[in-house]
């Protein structure tokens, strides 16, 4: 009867411990589909992905040689990325430690004594024992620790990739900002030159009483207004250069760069699975880590079995001293079963379960955020593409209006105020076109980042 009870207890313990051996699987109630909003329809979602835009190496997306050089510098020198790489090394060391926990621990404890009683001759004894102990992982304590270390390593690698993606995207955005500011400065300076010539012409004509002093004042005011905006653009360029230099891990300096018109980015923007995003991977690995922590907390309720032994030479055999020494060996098996730890194990298990639920919620929210970022970037790309043709028409029309108004002014059938208005419209249209071009490039960068791009070749 006692044997039957013992067998039943052992069987119950083994069955209840089966869960602690299970590997992590994504919970079924996690929503990972239908997260993209279709930019062509208000209420539809993109249920499936197409090609691997997010898997393209960054060199195939950012083809400007100057930009490629800057990204290479950033990937080598950015302090956040270097710190993330050190976290990976630390996680690799932790995994190595978890794997070595399966091996026995071996130690050497040599001892020697010299004793004398009542001035008799000294007695010398020695022992050279080698001790070893090995934990039998019957209930998964070591297994879950190793699995936890494995997913932690994956999490740190995913975080490093996320930082790398962020570094590439930030450098590209700042680079394109510089190109946009360069083009705005070029347009503004050209406009200022035109207004300067106009003001000089009006000045000469006003001296011959062809035009009133009001027209002269208007021409000078328009010129001064445009010239006054140039230092603001130059300051923005300087600040962006300094910010990019600092981000590269360098002292502030001028940035070599190309021109806005020469930039070529992917014309078609397909989607890729959100699982390609490193932050999504990191969030899921965090959930897996909490899962294994919960398993470890469960395993703490089960016995811990340890085998230990020692062997070595000694010349002490009880009360007798023998020379030469003899070989002494021993082996011990021990089982430690938790009975009452003042509620520590129960509290630890409850805390682990709560942390696992928190990680699950965080993972789901990360998926939602990722889907939103992809949808926003895709919508921005689509809308900026739609504006391109209309904006070009606006620029061409504003240019023609400016030229025609100037001709009418020279013929005396238009006022100088109309000339200024037409030139201002032309300037505004050109600046808007530059901003649209920048928005489109920024949309590509944002979408590439949102899809987890930024990997090396």
Regions found by a protein language model. Name each.
Residues 19, 151, 158-269, 380, ...:
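Periplasmic alpha-helical coiled-coil/stalk elements that build and connect Gram-negative outer-membrane
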Residues 81-84, 91, 149, 156, ...:
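Amphipathic alpha-helical coiled-coil segments
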Residues 1-16:
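Sec-dependent bacterial lipoprotein signal peptides
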Residues 196, 225-252, 393-451:
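Short segments within alpha-helical structural elements
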């Amino acid at each position: 009867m006692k044997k039957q009870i013992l067998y039943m207890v052992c069987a119950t313990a083994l069955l209840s411990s089966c869960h602690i051996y299970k590997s992590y699987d994504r919970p079924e109630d996690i929503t990972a589909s239908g997260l993209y909003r279709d930019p062509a329809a208000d209420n539809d979602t993109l249920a499936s992905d197409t090609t691997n835009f997010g898997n393209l190496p960054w060199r195939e997306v950012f083809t400007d040689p100057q930009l490629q050089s800057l990204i290479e510098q950033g990937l080598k020198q950015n302090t956040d990325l270097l710190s993330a790489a050190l976290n990976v090394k630390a996680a690799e060391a932790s995994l190595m430690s978890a794997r070595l926990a399966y091996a026995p621990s071996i130690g050497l404890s040599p001892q020697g004594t010299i004793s004398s009683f009542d001035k008799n001759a000294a007695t010398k004894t020695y022992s050279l024992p080698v001790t070893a102990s090995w934990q039998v992982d019957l209930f998964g304590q070591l297994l879950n620790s190793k699995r936890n270390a494995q997913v932690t390593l994956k999490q740190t690698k995913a975080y490093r990739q996320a930082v790398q993606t962020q570094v590439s995207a930030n450098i590209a955005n700042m680079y394109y900002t510089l190109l946009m500011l360069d083009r705005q400065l070029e347009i503004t300076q050209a406009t200022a030159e035109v207004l300067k010539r106009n003001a000089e012409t009006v000045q000469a004509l006003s001296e011959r009483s062809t035009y009133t002093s009001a027209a002269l004042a208007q021409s000078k005011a328009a010129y001064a207004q445009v010239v006054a905006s140039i230092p603001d653009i130059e300051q923005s360029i300087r600040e962006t250069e300094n910010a990019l230099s600092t981000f590269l891990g360098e002292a502030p300096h001028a940035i070599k760069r190309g021109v806005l018109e020469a930039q070529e980015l992917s014309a078609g923007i397909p989607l890729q699975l959100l699982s390609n995003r490193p932050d999504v991977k990191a969030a899921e690995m965090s959930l897996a880590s909490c899962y294994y922590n919960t398993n470890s907390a469960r395993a703490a309720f089960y016995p811990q079995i340890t085998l230990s032994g020692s062997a070595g030479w000694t010349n002490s055999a009880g009360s007798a001293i023998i020379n030469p020494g003899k070989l002494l060996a021993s082996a011990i098996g021990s089982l430690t079963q938790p009975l009452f730890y003042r509620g520590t194990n129960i509290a630890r298990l409850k805390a682990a379960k709560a942390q696992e639920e928190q990680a699950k919620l965080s993972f789901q929210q990360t998926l939602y955020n990722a889907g939103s970022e992809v949808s926003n970037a895709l919508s921005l790309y689509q809308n900026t593409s739609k504006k391109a043709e209309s904006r070009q028409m606006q620029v061409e029309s504003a240019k023609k209006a400016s030229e025609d108004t100037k001709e009418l002014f020279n013929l005396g059938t238009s006022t100088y105020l109309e000339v200024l208005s037409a030139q201002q419209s032309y300037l505004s249209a050109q600046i808007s076109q530059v901003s649209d071009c920048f928005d489109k490039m920024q949309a590509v960068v944002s979408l590439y980042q949102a899809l987890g791009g930024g990997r090396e070749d």
